[in-house]
From Swiss-Prot:
UniProt keywords, alphabetically: DNA-directed RNA polymerase, Nucleotidyltransferase, Transcription, Transferase
Annotated coiled-coil segments of the chain: none
UniProt keyword Electron transport, yes or no: no
Record's GO cellular component terms: DNA-directed RNA polymerase complex
Organism of origin: Staphylococcus saprophyticus subsp. saprophyticus (strain ATCC 15305 / DSM 20229 / NCIMB 8711 / NCTC 7292 / S-41)
Protein name: DNA-directed RNA polymerase subunit epsilon
Entry keyword annotation includes Cytoplasm: no
Length: 71
């Protein structure tokens, strides 16, 4: 399993505004599994980044680091 950081907007009907970008962390095997896990939410996904090594350790230090488990 890997941890992915998902950058998204809350409403897929609206134009993307960088200042409104939100993030969530999802543990999954692939990016495709992350997309399937989030498909029922009304998110406009901008980008999905796989976190590894030093980048993952850095993100873990954030107060907002809360990982959801993809099913």
């Amino acid at each position: 399993m890997a941890v992915f950081k998902v950058f998204y907007q809350h409403n897929k009907e609206e134009v993307i505004v960088r200042e409104h970008t939100q993030t969530i962390y999802v543990e999954a095997q692939t990016e495709e599994q992350v997309r399937r896990y989030l498909k029922d939410r009304n998110f406009n996904i901008e980008f999905i980044a796989k976190l590894e090594g030093a980048h993952l350790e850095y993100e873990k230090q954030s107060d907002h680091f809360n990982v959801e488990q993809a099913e």
